[in-house]
Every structure is written in structure tokens, then in C-alpha cells.
């Protein structure tokens, strides 16, 4: 028996924890955290520890499959690639390249982020994207409109920690250089030196139980809460006058805008007492420095971009931007530009969300169902499951079924793959080379995601597949690389780092640590060079230049029929819709749960463990109830990520709508839906 330990990093979530992998006779054996890896320093969550079970799963896709007469049959790679290339050639000639869509997964690894981007651009279609409307990108846009760039929370020297719509002990925010285990030490250490901890969340998360203040806010009302905080801070003159006068534009307009947006006004919307709002505003504004960690709980709402603008303004007017212990800019190592060619046409939602950098899936769905601005014909997906992750499942399914060609590239079967015409087996993160590049408080660094074992079955790297398709379509001249190793060399060339060096060193520092107060010399990366409390760019695009909270468009009849407000929760032991076939992870949480308050459960004769029916205007699901006091009455939480044919659980997006959208990012309200709950009579 041969065995050896090899270094790489995990690609199962944004944390990208460094790991040491024991390889026994060509198979993955034990996996443990790498104490030398800068970001994780030895920590490893259950997902990473289960790597062997994932890679060697009996459910792995191992061969190309072609749908024939309603069934999948095994075919060769040669036939699969030829078939796809022929269809793409026909579609391009008949309908134009822009009618081919591409969806990729969350950019957890660089291969997922970059996969098929060069191909789509060379082919001529601008309609490629990831789940950007659901995660991070809307928040990034909100911060960029105010501050010019994304910030991260600097907890090292802070005296006030605000966790807003985030749950970092369960779902790590990768940008902070913190992991769940270490985060458990950050809070006690901060509190020991007198720091205040504030958690703003409609659910009593683990952090909320130990916080100084848990703000039990109504779902989707964070903007109103933030505007009322600004009202108090300005009214009580708790803002940083020197910073505001020198480094902001539009303060007087903001001041006038929030004059009537008092805590009493916000209380009616947020269900947070006015006294609590005043207290939180005072604590945050007077406890310096203060850092805000925002999270995915803010993303999936129609007002997400404007909400994050408000949060950014809070940090700015209190002087907590780009200071030690506040919200700081952590520049990520700059890699080579990608793609190297660009389509000649704009993406199909460019007129609707012109400030967002890419098309989003809901507008692809619209185009498929309406034919406007044109009718898409084909879809290539890799490492994603759009049928389950997007709001309004029935509408998404109806749209996908209209496509002439669906190609799914993944390591495991998915609900989306069930609709595919061709399924291609993907190599796992342990079966091909990749790289990672991260910002860090102590400096940015790059690392090698190393090929640990040979690919299972006939699985291939995404770059192998897209290059072979490009070659068949006469596009290979657009590729500055042909292999994963050449791709790594190309992307890291501005950093003077090579694949060979990464093989030897594994981790290479490439940028210095965080610098504070950079704006004093360079200004902010906004049109004015200052923090923009009033945004002329938004005004020019007929959007609110100062954030305006608008009530939810819900009739009294709707509220009476569906009196409960629901949201979703992603269990931390899974990755979106993946890994529910992994026994050791399934043991942690074998099935999805509905969290419902004791009072609401009693009124509906629902006991803990009973099956309940959750019904919304869009549809209904049956799910086991968990009766709890960690949420407010009138509010329920449904677990997200189930719905594959083999996992035995319901898809929460049967309940959600995709019609109310953020006008700046296209974000849909996956995190808020009206519903009613009854006991399942078959229980």
C-alpha cells in the first residue's frame, strides 16, 4: 500500500480552508485542517472533513450521458462534444450567439468563477452569469455606490461589533479572514476588553444568544431600521463632523431626507421598539471604532442595494470607514483580465439593470417565457442547480423546459440535470489543478488547489471541456491557455507567480497587509472622490439618489389569507443543494425543518415534529415542524437546499416569488414570502 500526505484547500464553500489530504492507493483517505494555511490555520468544518465521501460517492457522475427517448444513455466524450458543438453551431447561425445562455455556480473556486467565461465571450454571447443576484454582488454594488469599493469588518481592534443579516458561526464570511471556530473566540475576546456586540437578525442565531443586543427585526425592513438610525445620529449630532465635512457629498440632502424617518416611524415597519432604535444608534455612534459585518440575509430582497447603501452611510458618517477596528478596504490580489475577448452585443437585461455588471437568472427566465428581448435557445450550466436555487420553482421549470439544448456539467446528479439533454461528468476539486487568491488583513496571498488523485471515471476539468468545444467551433485562437496549468500561469502572471512555484511553495504572499486611512491621500473610488451620500449616478438612471423605503406591495386580502411571513435558512453542514447524499453530513440534519413559534403552532394545532403544510401564493410544501422560541410570533423559517429527486425533501422555492425585484441588481425576494401553515392531515 502506498500513501502520502498532500496539501491543497477545500472548494466546498467560500472559506476555502487549507487541508492536508492522505492519499492511499490513489484514493482519498483522511482529510484534516492545515495549520499552516493563512486563512483557516488548521480549522476544518464537517463538509471539508467529508471530502472522501463526496469524491468517492456512489452517485458520482462518471460518464457523459445523452437523453434518448426520455432516458439517459452512456456515450463517449467524442460523441458528447461533437453533438454539443454541432447544436451550438446551428443555433449561432440560425438565431445568433446571444441566444445561448450559461449559468455557473457560486464562485467558491476560481475554476467555477472562470469556467466557460472565455468560451461564451469567444462564441459571442454576453449572457453568462452565476447566482450573483442571490449572493454578495448586490451588496457589493450598494457599497460601491457609496464608498467606491467593498469593505470588510476589522474585528481586531474594534470596540463595537455589529452582525447584520449574517451568521458567521454557521456560514463563514470569507472576506474577513475569520472562520467559525475562531469567531467563537473573537466575540469573547472583544467583550472582555469592553466591546459591545449587536446582532440584527429576525432569528435568534447562536451569536444573538451571546450578544449584548439582539435586534429582532421584521424580515426585509432593514433599510427602514438603518434610516432611522441615521435620523437619530444626525439629530443628536453623533456623527463625525470633520469626516462628513471633508469626505462626503450630499450630507445636507441626506439630513433633510431622514428628518421625518424617526424611530417611531421605523417601529411601525420593523417591529423594533423606538427606544431600542435610539439605544442602538447611540451605542454604535459613540463606541469607537465600530465594525459592521453584513451578510446574505440582506441579499435576497428587492431593496438590497439601497439597504446596503444605508448601512454604508452609517459607517461613513460615524467615521468608521478605513480605520483600524472599523470597516476597511482589503484589496484582493490582481490577476490577469478575464475574459480576453468581449461579445459585440449587450446582455439581455442591460436595459433593465444597467448598473449591474451582468445578466441575472430571473431575466433569463423572463426571456424564455416571453421571447423578449429575444428567445434563448440553449443553456450550459456547470457546478450549479438553477432549478432549485432560484425563486418561483414552477416558473423556472416551465422556462427551462422550453430550451432546445441543456448541457449540465457537474460532479453529482441534480434536479437541473434531470431536465438536461446532455450531462457531462466534472472532475472534483481533488482531481485537477486550480488556484485561489485572497485578501487578508496580514496581506493577500495565492495558493495552489492541487490535483490529489486521478479523475474518477471519465470526469474532466471544465477547462478541458470548454477548450475542446472551442476547438470544434473554430474558437481556439481566442484562448491564451489550453490546460489548467496554463490557465493558472496566465491568471497569475501580473503577480509574477507561476504554477511551478505554487507546486513547490503551495502558498505565496503577494500583497502587503491592510493600510488604513488611504482615502486621505487617494480619496475614494467614486466619481466625486468622496463618500456619496447622494448618488448622482442613480439619479441619472432614474433611481433613488438617497435611499427610500417602500412598503411591501401586499393587499389586506393577501395578508389575511397568508398571515405569516416566511424566510429561508441554509443549514451550515450542506453546500446549497449539495451533499445530502453524504451519510456523515446527513446525520447532522437528516431533513429540512420548518421553524415556527410556540404561539403560532398552538393556534394551528401543530406539535414539535408534526408534518405541516406551508402554503404561499406560489405553491405549497409538506415539511416537519420544529416548534421554537428563537423566532418571533408571526414569522417562520424554512430550510433551503432540498428538492433533488433523491434527497427526499421539499424545495422551499416552490413558495417564493420572483416578481418583486431589486431595480438595481435584479435580486428576488427569496428571503421573504407570505404564507399560511396547517397541520398535514396525513401525519
Could you describe each region identified by the protein language model?
Residues 229, 249-362:
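Active-site phosphate/pyrophosphate-binding segments
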Residues 167, 210-211, 260-265, 293-298, ...:
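Flexible glycine/proline-enriched surface loops and loop-helix/loop-strand junctions
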Residues 96-99, 239-244, 291, 322-329, ...:
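Flexible, glycine/charged-enriched surface loops at secondary-structure junctions
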Residues 1-236, 265, 273, 602, ...:
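N-terminal export/assembly segments and adjacent metallocofactor-ligating motifs
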Residues 114-189, 195-200, 224-227, 312-418, ...:
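Extended redox/cofactor-interaction regions of prokaryotic respiratory oxidoreductases
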Residues 452, 456, 460-506, 577-595, ...:
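Long, contiguous, secondary-structure-rich segments that constitute the structural scaffold
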Residues 246-249, 284, 327-338, 481-495, ...:
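A glycine-rich phosphate-binding loop feature that marks nucleotide/adenosyl-phosphate handling sites
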Residues 430-455, 470:
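Glycine/threonine-rich phosphate-binding loop and adjacent beta-strand/alpha-helix elements that clamp
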Amino acid at each position: 500500500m502506498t500513501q502520502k500526505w498532500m496539501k491543497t484547500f477545500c472548494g466546498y464553500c467560500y472559506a476555502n480552508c487549507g487541508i492536508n489530504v492522505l492519499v492511499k492507493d490513489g484514493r482519498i483517505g483522511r482529510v484534516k485542517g492545515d495549520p499552516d494555511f493563512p486563512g483557516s490555520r488548521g480549522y476544518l468544518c464537517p463538509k471539508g472533513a467529508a471530502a472522501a465521501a463526496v469524491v468517492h460517492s456512489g452517485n458520482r457522475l462518471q460518464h457523459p450521458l445523452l437523453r434518448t427517448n426520455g432516458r439517459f444513455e452512456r456515450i463517449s466524450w467524442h460523441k458528447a462534444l461533437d453533438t454539443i458543438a454541432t447544436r451550438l453551431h446551428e443555433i449561432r447561425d440560425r438565431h445568433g450567439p446571444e441566444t445561448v445562455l450559461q449559468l455557473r455556480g457560486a464562485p467558491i473556486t476560481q475554476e467555477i468563477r472562470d469556467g466557460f467565461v472565455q468560451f461564451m465571450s469567444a462564441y459571442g454571447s454576453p449572457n453568462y452569469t452565476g447566482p450573483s443576484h442571490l449572493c454578495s454582488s448586490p451588496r457589493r454594488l450598494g457599497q460601491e455606490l457609496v464608498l467606491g469599493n467593498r469593505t470588510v469588518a476589522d474585528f481586531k481592534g474594534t470596540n463595537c461589533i455589529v452582525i447584520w443579516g449574517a451568521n458567521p458561526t454557521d456560514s463563514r464570511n470569507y472576506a474577513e479572514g475569520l472562520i467559525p471556530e475562531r469567531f467563537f473566540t473573537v466575540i469573547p475576546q472583544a467583550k472582555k476588553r469592553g466591546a459591545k456586540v449587536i446582532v440584527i437578525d429576525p432569528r435568534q442565531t447562536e451569536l444573538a444568544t451571546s450578544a449584548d443586543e439582539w435586534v429582532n427585526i421584521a424580515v426585509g425592513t432593514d433599510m427602514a431600521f438603518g434610516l432611522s438610525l441615521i435620523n437619530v445620529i444626525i439629530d443628536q449630532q453623533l456623527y463625525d463632523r470633520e469626516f462628513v465635512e471633508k469626505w462626503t457629498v450630499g450630507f445636507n440632502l441626506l439630513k433633510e431626507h431622514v428628518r421625518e424617518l424617526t424611530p417611531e416611524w421605523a417601529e411601525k415597519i420593523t417591529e423594533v421598539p423606538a427606544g431600542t432604535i435610539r439605544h442602538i444608534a447611540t451605542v454604535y455612534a459613540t463606541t469607537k471604532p465600530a465594525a459592521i459585518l453584513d451578510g446574505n440575509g440582506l441579499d435576497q430582497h428587492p431593496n438590497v442595494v439601497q439597504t446596503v447603501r444605508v448601512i454604508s452611510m452609517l459607517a461613513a458618517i460615524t467615521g468608521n470607514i478605513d480605520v483600524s477596528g472599523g470597516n476597511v478596504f482589503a484589496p484582493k490580489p490582481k490577476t490577469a483580465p478575464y475574459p480576453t475577448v468581449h461579445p459585440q452585443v449587450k446582455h439581455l437585461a442591460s436595459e433593465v439593470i444597467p448598473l449591474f455588471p451582468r445578466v441575472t437568472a430571473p431575466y433569463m427566465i423572463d426571456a424564455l417565457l416571453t421571447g423578449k428581448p429575444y428567445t434563448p435557445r440553449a443553456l450550459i450550466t456547470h457546478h450549479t442547480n438553477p432549478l432549485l436555487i432560484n425563486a418561483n420553482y414552477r416558473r423556472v421549470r416551465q422556462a427551462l423546459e422550453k430550451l432546445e439544448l441543456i448541457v449540465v456539467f457537474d460532479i453529482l446528479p441534480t434536479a437541473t440535470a434531470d431536465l438536461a439533454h446532455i450531462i457531462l461528468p466534472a472532475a472534483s476539486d481533488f482531481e485537477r489543478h486550480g488556484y485561489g487568491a485572497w485578501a487578508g488583513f496580514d496581506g493577500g496571498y495565492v495558493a495552489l488547489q492541487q490535483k490529489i488523485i486521478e479523475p474518477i471515471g471519465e470526469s474532466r476539468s471544465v477547462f478541458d471541456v470548454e477548450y475542446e468545444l472551442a476547438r470544434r467551433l473554430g474558437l481556439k485562437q481566442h484562448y491564451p491557455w489550453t490546460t489548467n496549468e496554463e490557465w493558472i500561469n496566465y491568471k497569475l502572471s501580473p503577480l509574477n507567480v507561476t504554477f511551478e512555484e505554487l507546486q513547490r511553495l503551495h502558498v505565496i504572499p503577494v500583497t502587503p497587509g491592510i493600510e488604513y486611512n488611504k482615502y486621505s491621500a487617494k480619496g475614494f473610488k467614486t466619481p466625486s472622490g468622496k463618500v456619496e451620500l447622494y448618488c448622482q449616478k442613480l439619479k441619472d438612471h432614474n433611481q433613488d439618489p438617497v435611499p427610500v423605503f417602500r412598503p411591501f406591495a401586499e393587499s389586506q386580502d393577501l395578508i389575511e389569507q397568508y398571515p405569516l411571513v416566511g424566510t429561508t435558512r441554509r443549514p451550515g453542514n450542506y453546500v446549497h443543494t449539495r451533499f445530502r447524499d453524504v451519510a456523515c453530513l446527513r446525520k447532522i440534519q437528516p431533513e429540512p425543518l420548518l421553524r415556527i413559534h410556540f404561539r403560532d403552532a398552538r393556534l394551528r394545532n401543530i406539535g414539535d415534529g408534526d408534518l405541516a403544510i406551508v402554503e404561499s401564493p406560489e405553491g405549497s410544501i409538506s415539511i416537519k415542524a420544529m416548534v421554537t422560541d428563537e423566532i418571533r410570533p408571526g414569522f417562520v423559517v424554512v430550510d433551503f437546499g432540498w428538492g433533488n429527486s433523491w434527497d427526499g425533501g421539499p424545495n422551499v422555492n416552490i413558495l417564493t416569488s420572483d416578481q418583486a425585484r431589486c431595480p438595481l441588481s435584479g435580486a428576488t425576494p427569496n428571503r421573504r414570502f407570505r404564507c399560511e401553515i396547517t397541520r398535514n392531515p396525513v401525519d
